[in-house]
Amino acid sequence: MKKTIFILATLLICGVAVGKKAPKQTKDLWPDGTEIEAWFKDTASVKLEGLGRQYRVTDYGVVNDGRIHTKELQALIDKVAQDGGGVLVVPEGVYMTGAVFFKQGVHLYLKAGGVLMGSNDPSDYPLLQTRIEGETCKYYSALINADGLDGFTISGKGAIDGNGYTFWKHFWERRAWNNKCTNKDEQRPRLVFISNCKNVQIEGINLQNSPFWTTHIYNSERVKLLNLHIYSPAKPVKAPSTDAIDLDVVKNILVKGCYMSVNDDAVAIKGGKGPYADAFRTKYEGVDLSKFPEMQGDGGNENIIIEDCVYGFCHGCLTLGSESVYNHNIILRRIKVDEANNLLWLKMRPDTPQQYEYVTVEDIEGNGKNFILVAPWTQFYDLKGRETTPMSYSDHITMRNIRFDCNVFFNVIQREDQYHLSNFTFENLDITAQKKEFHTEYVENFSVKNVNVK
């Protein structure tokens, strides 16, 4: 009898109601209704001791003397790879380098106060065939490059600093006499470029002052960006096109616990541009695609979660485009926003067939200029001889559980000759806006529930 009483008491203490079934845990689902796999819940930190033999960079000629040590740093990466792998450890101090290229089995760890500082000399970043603005082309390499690697990590409490001021200044000086100057005319290195990789984790460090895009992930899968501080200034000198995170032909991406404040988009979903950029999923009879080599490598993006982040100034918290073709299952949730231009920005290119579908933005507080912006994006418009304008689509777009102060609530331009909007859901929105206009007729099948705009 005593044993029975003890068991019952234990069950009650543990919160299990005797005679009742335990409540089922709700599954975490993608916007299309499929289940999110457990991989997205595993946010365990990288352990330095688990990365293999440690190579302190100062023991191999990379010293804090203000000189550029690209050769020494690359030689160390090559040595570690030849020796079977390990981790480069950057101690406290500032260490200057140009572009370096990591190899299989070689990791990077930056201790608190340890900074890898990029050279401000363009010749320290070799030109190579790479991926920029939705095209395959020649461009500068990044400061940190990883291509074709499995299991690559960057971690620690230090910083990678792009030392971008000189590059920014040159860009704006050139713009002053040529207002059509582009990022390809005034090339600048990215900070981190991850391409053709899988099982990558970048965590804990500061990524700052990039000359161009800060973190570019291309043709990669299973990448986690955790607890990063990503920054470039919007004043007194604007850091042009310093997107925090560019996701370009990727699958299974987690961005969690990051702070982002940059002079462009915080998270931009890319993938390609041009009249046949969707050739990876659409057959074009009678079209010689070999005439468009810049579109080789275009692709879609699937299964992306951005959560538990804090945003300072940026152009877009989540931007689809401008070089984007197909995006499926994108979630932005549990974020705080201060001074963003746009919470959700759908850039619709009239020269590119685009499909944005199953996008959810939820559980958000903050302020910005536009709650949602949907509009044509005509920069570098080029049909490349195609006679008809390709149609684009945005479908199953959900925004819910949001409290937001903004200038414009519904900044949506209707262009049925270029794109079609369908199956939007606005639910549980508490909005304070200067411009409150709301055109549900712009969207086919628009569900509106508990939306308060004041």
Where are each of the predicted segments found?
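Short glycine/acidic-rich loop motifs that flank beta-strands on beta-rich extracellular proteins
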Residues: G85, G98-A99, S119-D121, N163-F167, ...
